[in-house]
Amino acid sequence: MTQLIEQKAPAVCHAMRVFEEDYRAVGKDDLARMLALLYLIREFETTLLDLKDENLIHGPVHTSIGQEAVAAGVATALRKTDMVGSTHRAHGHFLSKALMYYAPEGFQPLRDPITPKMQEAINKTLAEIMGLKDGWCGGRGGSMHLYDGESGNLGSNAIVGGGIPLATGVAWAQKLQRKDNVVVSFFGDGAVNQGCFHEVANMAALWGVPIIYFIENNFYAVGTNVNEASFVQDLALRTLSYGINSVIVDGMDPVAVYLATRDACTRMRANPFPFVIEAKTYRHYHHAGRLAGSAFGYRTKEEEAQWLEKDPITAFPKKLMSLGLLSEAEDERLKAMAKDALAKALAFCTDVKDGKRYIPAEKWPAPESVLRHVRCEDDVFAGIQFKEREDFTTFRPMTYGEAIAAATLRNMERDERVIVLGEEVANLRGGPYGATKGIKEAFPERLFNTPISETGFSGIAGGAASAGLRPVVEIMFPDFALMASDQLFNQIGKLRHMYGGRISFPLVVRTRIAIGYGYGGQHSMDPAAYFALFSGWRILAPSNAFDYIGLFNTAVRFNDPVVILEHGLLYAEKDQVPADTMDYYIQYGKAKVLREGKDVTVLTYLTGVAKCLEAAKQLEAEGISAEVIDLRTLDYTGMDYETIGASVKKTGSVLIVEQSPRSLSLSGRLADEIQSRFFDYLDCPVGKVTAPDVPLPVSKVLEEFCIPSVARIKEAMAIGGRHQF
């Protein structure tokens, strides 16, 4: 007979009740700080709506009017060195954290005026939302993308759930760097249904990450009620299976939020581990703008009226007065302080003519400034002499696969900020393909196996990179990068630019192309053209062990995200590397002419190099001289057009050889760029050799048909050599 034994969840969820004595225990100083923040946030966001109505704000304005108790309570409970990450509805979180950071020690709003530094924070926040040059990000981030790393504002994020992995990575970095700072990641009820949240919550529990996942449950994801989106209504229950304890609080009461946050931080500093706080709160207006939700029919006026009675802007001061913790005069002082601060911010950002506000021309950013900060503009290679094979005299043998492991290990020896993470990297005697061999023995504390959670570990690596580490991430097959697309491209690839160049993501992603192994259409992607769509990424493709070491060293030194493309068929290929050093750098953006010729320029990379060299050798007997160039750098910004151009001017003909299907290849855009730059030197259009436009099949015969062969490349070279494309 079967027996069913109840299994208890590995964590617990509590609901918090707050009593009058809790208010008194908090003390008048912190209560006044919370109330001051409430008034400032409300005045700030009311001003935003006025400016939007006056057409002085471009883009959406998502206010948190009604939800201010959350931001005020959390910010008051945190230390200056703690950090917060937020959402598209971030004005309150951002402003509260910035003001508490820039306030002098012991600041008491019932006694002290807002300081110039605090006023500057308000001014810069308003300027950013208005798209002005004096904003935190130079105006390019706006309402949904606010960033100020100094004050612990990790950045607000317009992708629902998109900031959670990054915040988790920052918190993980605090632990690895032996700091006791806590990170709070704010997100709404809608984000609880995003897979990225569940991936990183599980990893945060596995790794003991000091982060508070703060769910602002305002019951509506735009107009979708939480009971339409989640079977479980108390969202804090959903992380119990990950072993994460949680508490549910009244999100309209700043004291409840403060106490829950303070207690979680205290436990976390003593024993780093994630925690979930769910605040039941309410936004009085629709998703964006000034209209109420009832105007759109997804909730009733009666419901809105019930929640309006709980509005913290009126309920909280009333409660404090009833307990003798606030006088009417003190209340009026805090209200006046908020109004005065916003009046000054408006005067900073606008002027008035004929009774109408306008933005003076000098407040706008220079249009051409938008071209800056896509990538790091610092000279990180100052004093470095780049090397090529010809610069060395003594060598030793090494395979491509050995070079990957050796270069990684050497960089970990040189820089304690370098960590390695990915699936199986600490297993199987050096990872699934030997690329991390020796690292577990040398640096077990900096080598991290991950779950099969590409979104999670990619985003966590991005957050850790922004916090000062230099992660090396292995994505086992390039196709799996599609699972992590939001983190790799919307986040890591864009945020430097969106935040005005104030953040860096110095991480390396390694991935192994498996074309030719019979893995089929979901494990055989060459992702070069995909990564090249996002200009924040640098792309390197070393075709031999010597180049791998030099380019890996270069990649780790960058303050930008770099993807290194490898090919499985190269792993066993032997090469010669310097006998007495691994500390050399190959210049990013520098292609390598491997064979000189005069009739056709052949551009290729990775396994295409050997095939093109063989085809060129065979063609030589037929009187056609091909110049073969290993591109090495594949992103369009870093492409070595100087070397390409010098060759084109000599040959008058170009052939691009890739293993990708035509629609997933670099060749289309690269050919267009070459024809635009060197049109006068070309005798014919640019030729292309790629796989046909199909997912690569498993069948050996079918896959071999798809992959460009030496014979097919030779045939195309011959046409190009005769300038007949």
Where are these regions (language model features)?
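Active-site nucleophile and cofactor-binding loops and adjacent substrate-binding regions
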Residues: 59-67, 88-89, 146-164, 188, ...
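A glycine-rich helix N-cap at a beta->alpha junction
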Residues: 126-128, 205-215, 449, 493-511
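Glycine-rich loop at the start of a catalytic domain that most often binds anionic cofactors/ligands
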Residues: 64, 72-80, 96-106, 431-442, ...
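Conserved acidic/glycine
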Residues: 1-70, 287, 291-443, 452, ...
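Cofactor-binding active-site loop characterized by glycine-rich and histidine/acidic residues
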Residues: 46-49, 54-207, 225-231, 236, ...
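Glycine/charged-rich beta-loop-alpha catalytic/anionic-binding loops adjacent to active sites
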Residues: 52-57, 108-109, 142-157, 181-186, ...
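Glycine-rich ThDP/TPP pyrophosphate-binding loop and its adjacent helix/strand module
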Residues: 152-343, 532-652, 656-657
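Acidic-glycine-rich active-site phosphate/pyrophosphate-binding loop
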Residues: 46, 131-148, 235, 427-442, ...
